[in-house]
């Protein structure tokens, strides 16, 4: 048998990056803290349904699947597979927090509080630097990085780290102007993101109304304008923010 001849025609299938991909992460049931949430898994399910209808290929991670290593590795793999003009949607619903840091003037940095602990803005910035030129990343964080109290009957999506005073932060360090990431923050710096109930079903307030605002042909700028109208109009004291390069805000889904 001529192995050389066989090798000449046997070639592995090329790995073709997905033009529109979504990574969706949600945590209701936390491993080591008592203040679990109610609407994060519904947020993920609802986003998956809508994004799939829009032509996205979705990967979903829930509760114990949303570890720091899984989040990092999944986002990294998706970024490294991207080509110019590819679109990656990253959705996170869960707690945010603040931790002590030597990198910030005030001594604290923001973090997503994942199933096994905080995922800091430093690690997120590592991922940003892997984004290929010309690719677009839309990252939505339905969480908060401030320690304010939410009014009943809603919960707030903030976890107060032991030994850390209440400080007010937002995702400013992971929204650098030179980045190809466009970031939707669920609330402004002095507010909290609500984990609420709509018609007997739990959702994040930001996600619930965001799903009504984005779709094919809608720009990021139009989306944030609509959300800012919906939330206060329905009694929620939170003003989502759009962060990143302003020239990317006109990009349409």
Regions found by a protein language model. Give the residues of each.
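Cysteine endopeptidase catalytic domains of the caspase/legumain-like
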Residues: 2-253
């Amino acid at each position: 048998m001529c192995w050389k001849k066989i090798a000449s025609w046997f070639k592995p299938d090329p790995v073709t990056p997905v033009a529109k991909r979504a990574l969706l992460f949600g945590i209701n049931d936390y491993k080591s803290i008592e203040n679990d949430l109610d609407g994060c898994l519904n947020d993920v399910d609802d986003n998956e349904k809508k994004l799939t209808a829009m032509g996205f290929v979705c990967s979903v991670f829930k509760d114990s699947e949303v570890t720091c290593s899984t989040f990092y590795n999944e986002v990294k793999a998706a970024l490294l597979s991207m080509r110019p003009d590819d679109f990656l949607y990253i959705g996170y619903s869960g707690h945010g927090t603040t931790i002590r840091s030597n990198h910030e003037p005030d001594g604290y940095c923001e973090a997503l509080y994942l199933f096994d602990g905080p995922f800091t803005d430093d690690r997120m910035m590592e991922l940003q630097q892997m984004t290929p030129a010309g690719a677009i990343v839309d990252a939505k964080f339905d969480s908060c990085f401030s320690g304010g109290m939410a009014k009943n009957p809603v919960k707030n999506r903030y976890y107060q780290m032991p030994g850390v005073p209440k400080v007010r932060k937002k995702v400013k360090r992971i929204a650098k102007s030179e980045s190809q990431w466009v970031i939707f923050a669920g609330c402004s710096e002095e507010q909290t993101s609500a984990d609420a109930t709509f018609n007997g079903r739990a959702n994040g307030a930001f996600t619930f109304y965001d799903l009504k605002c984005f779709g094919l042909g809608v720009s990021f700028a139009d989306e944030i304008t609509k959300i800012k109208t919906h939330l206060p109009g329905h009694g929620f004291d939170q003003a989502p923010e759009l962060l990143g390069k302003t020239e990317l805000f006109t990009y349409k889904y």
